[in-house]
């Protein structure tokens, strides 16, 4: 019985990165051997055990065979005769198909170290095509390390998409990999890889449809709506924004794919037009509620947020109410963060100031100075409970108006200079 450290732990060790989780493979043993040594069985589908002291996962070396479409259609074989190389061969990429023995020696039968040094993601064997999740995982690794995909691997990924393997993916698994990819250092790269292999058209056709749709060059020097979306997503990542914010950044302009061709490159009403496509994506991916709600909010209101300097005080109050800013100020603030990414996610606009965010937050703070509890009590005492909402609005407007007037004056002064 021999144990080897495998997979991501070996890869990250060779890259000089912190090793978070350690997985082990056991060669020359069976389930009875593991149980006799005090290991606890935990694998539902595979022979995986927890070490009695470290609680790290130890899996028996195994081979796999495809039995049906999708990522669950597999049968496996694990016994004492399965070799380390056979176990490594079933893995997805060469950089994940390395092992380290007890003496620290690296076992690398498929050239993983070479590909790490070259910054290449390459599949281990044709068995890569048996699991469609590997399309998403490869795109995610590209986003993490900014590696390129080997030509033969991207070709195989295209074939998998053409054969309908991506259609067999279930929403939960897509979201799991997709969310991880959005939180990588270079999420733009994930979307680019998915587009290159054709999977984006299957998994996120609404995003794929943005590529080739022109925008006004004075607002968007990058011209292409798809490129702007990638730049906005990447800017959100560079800002260190959260998963809901990055997800909203990706979906904020879906309405531009709905713009009638006769008015291009203008996109009047794309904020409203994008709401339904955002809902469709949310439903298809079964996005968590906090991600789905923020994506819809940003899509619907980002243009209004940008144009705050042009709004009347009553309109501002209406927006604060409709976006639920009084009850959910944190979500309101995250929506404004995405608006910064939208503004700066344009060619040569990475450092464009966005005073609108601070102004919206100041407007919300000012409106909250109106003592709604006191106003409600006074109205009830006067037998005018039906006027509570109206009186609260009036008090809030009294707080908003001077602030908005000062902002517009400062804006006019800046424009004149």
Swiss-Prot record:
GO terms for molecular function: ATP binding; CCA tRNA nucleotidyltransferase activity; CCACCA tRNA nucleotidyltransferase activity; cyclic-nucleotide phosphodiesterase activity; magnesium ion binding; phosphatase activity; tRNA binding. Magnesium is required for nucleotidyltransferase activity. Nickel for phosphatase activity. GO terms for biological process: RNA repair; tRNA 3'-terminal CCA addition; tRNA surveillance. It holds the Pfam family PolyA_pol_RNAbd. Residues 225-326 form the HD domain. InterPro entries: CCA_bact (IPR012006), HD/PDEase_dom (IPR003607), HD_domain (IPR006674), NT_sf (IPR043519), PolA_pol_head_dom (IPR002646), PolyA_RNA-bd (IPR032828), tRNA_CCA-adding_enzyme (IPR050124). Its cofactor is Mg(2+); Ni(2+). ATP binds at residues 8, 11, 91, 137, 140. It comes from the Bacteria. Belongs to the tRNA nucleotidyltransferase/poly(A) polymerase family. Bacterial CCA-adding enzyme type 1 subfamily. This is Multifunctional CCA protein. It comes from Neisseria meningitidis serogroup B (strain ATCC BAA-335 / MC58). The lineage of its organism: Bacteria, Pseudomonadati, Pseudomonadota, Betaproteobacteria, Neisseriales.
